[in-house]
Structure formats: structure tokens, C-alpha cells
Amino acid sequence: MISIVKSKSFGLAAVMTLICSVAGIFLAKLPYVNLIGALVIALLLGISLQVLPVGVREEAAPGIGFISNKFLRLGIILLGFRLNLTKLADAGIKTILVAMLGVSGTIVLTYWLSKKFGAEDELAVLSACGCGICGAAAVMGVSPQIESRDEERKRENEVLAVAVVCVMGTVFTLLEIVIKPMLGLTDSQFGIVAGGSLHEIAHAIAAGSAFGEASLDSALIMKLSRVLLLAPVALIIGYWYQRRLVKESAQDHTQAPKKLPIPWFLGGFILTSILGTFLPFPPVVLDGLVQAAYVFLGMAMAALGISVNFSVIFKRGGTVFGAAAISSTCLMIFMIIMSKLFF
């Protein structure tokens, strides 16, 4: 690892992806563009770098691979500082329970529909987690738990899953803002709907802030309740995938993976959420750590954009987009009902 960090390839890759990541953070603060979110903007900027000469991209390739893997995990760990467990506890058990129902139901429904529509397993799982938990960060957090024999295909699936949650999240953000006056919800109830149904944290913030502080506060608490489920969901999916591989290997008389991959970075995610909650960090320090998380995640997303083959992706997109549209609609309806009944 030290040798690659010292290499020219890593330096070139770091400069390319850092520019994309920082630009994504600043562009995400602009009106309307904020609906997309910093991570997706970084991905799109990474895609734009595919116009660079082939020689430059080939020289950066080892560093790009390192950043897409290691920086992703570092970003997920630091993202834990965004979770304030005390605030989640204050919101009450009903908030966590509703989040659990929404997340689990959406993951199962999106996965089932994706398979029905002909999507491959890995793509169905990643899209389901992105729709159910927290968008691009969930896709990238769950992906390391999925064993794959074809790394290029896996990268294509990651980008396609991110594209799904970006498009669906943006569409449903606008839809929920438009229909809010027709729903008979208080501002706080609408925040619950936005935080419980929209895909990215950026989407929840954009919708919640449209109707004042009460709406925004509710949206953030509900959304972070879903983010809290990232670690357990990734563990469950890793275990489930491992069991499936063992079973398939027994049937095919091939060698199965010997052990479940240990998601140490998810342990770090939980640890940082505990540290951020119970240690007296100044707000400016916590904000800085969360910003650092998005810088590293943005670099990983840009690296993904630089290295992926999009001509293949566009041919396979329809199956998961249809599934995500249906499951996102069901999740929105579920959250409207829950907000009226319990909040």
C-alpha cells in the first residue's frame, strides 16, 4: 500500500479525483444543482475525464483503483461522525421502527422487482440498498460485501445503481414538494415523509428545507435513522451472499470463498458515530470530519466514473429503473401513511 501511495500513478489519480470531489461539493451548493448531490456530481465529473488521452488514464489506472477502494472505506468511516445517536434516541423508538420497516420493505421489493424484470443479482442488490438506505453512499458501502468474479462488471453495476438512485431521488424530491399542499400534512409530517422516502441525504435536505425548519429537522432525523441501518444491512447482505456462494459452489463442485469478508470499515462507521455522539467535539471539528468524509467519498466516486464502461451500462439500465420507480412510489405512499398515523 505504501509503494502505490508514493507512486506517480497515485499522485496523478489523487489530483484528478480530488478536483472532481471538491468541485462536486461546491457545485452541490448551487440552487437546483443541490438536488443531485455532491457525490453524484463527482461521479459525473469523473465520467467527463474519460476524454483525457488514453496514455494519461492508463498511467493513472493503478492509483484510480486504489482510491476507488481504500478512499471509499475511509469516507464511510468518517461519515459516522454525521450520526448523532442521542438525537436519534430522542426521536423515539417509533422513528427507528418506521425506518426499519421502510428500509427492509424497500430493499426486498426493489430486489424482487429487479429480478422479475431481468436484472442480474449484484445489480439488483445494489439498487435495492441505494433506494432503501441512503443513495450512493449505501451502494458503495454494501458493494464490498458482495463477492464478484468480474471486477469490471461490478464497477458497471455500482455506477448504474448510483445512477438509479440519483434519477429517482431527484424526480421524487420534485414530486413530493409539488404534491405536499394536497396531502394535508403538517410541515413536520412532511419532513418525516421526505426523510423516510427520498434517496440521498441531499434529496431529503432539499425537500425538507422547502417548508421551513420544522420540516428540515424532521427530514434529517428520519433520514439519519435510515443511514444508521447501513452497517447492519451490509452485514446481513454479506452473510446472505456468502451462504449463496457456498450453496452454488456445492452444486457446481467449485471452491467456495472460505470466509465472510469482514467489513472493518463498517465497524469504523459505528465507532465514529459513537465518538461523535459522546465525546465533546467542537461543532466545527465535527463539520470538518463530515466534510472530509464527503471529499474521500467524492474521490472514490470520481475514480469510479473515470474507470467504467458506460456503453455497456446504458444497455442494461431499463430493468432496475423500472423496479426503482415502482418501489420508490410504494415507499413514498408508506411514509405518507406512517406520518399521518404516528407523527
From Swiss-Prot:
The chain crosses the membrane at residues 10-27, 32-54, 64-86, 91-113, 123-145, 157-179, 219-241, 262-284, 288-310, 317-339. The keyword Transmembrane helix applies. It is a multi-pass membrane protein. Keywords: Cell membrane, Membrane, Transmembrane, Transmembrane helix. It is found in: Cell membrane. Pfam families: Cons_hypoth698. One of its GO terms (cellular component) is plasma membrane. InterPro entries: UPF0324_pro. It comes from the Bacteria. Its main location: membrane. Belongs to the UPF0324 family. This is UPF0324 membrane protein LJ_1117. It comes from Lactobacillus johnsonii (strain CNCM I-12250 / La1 / NCC 533).
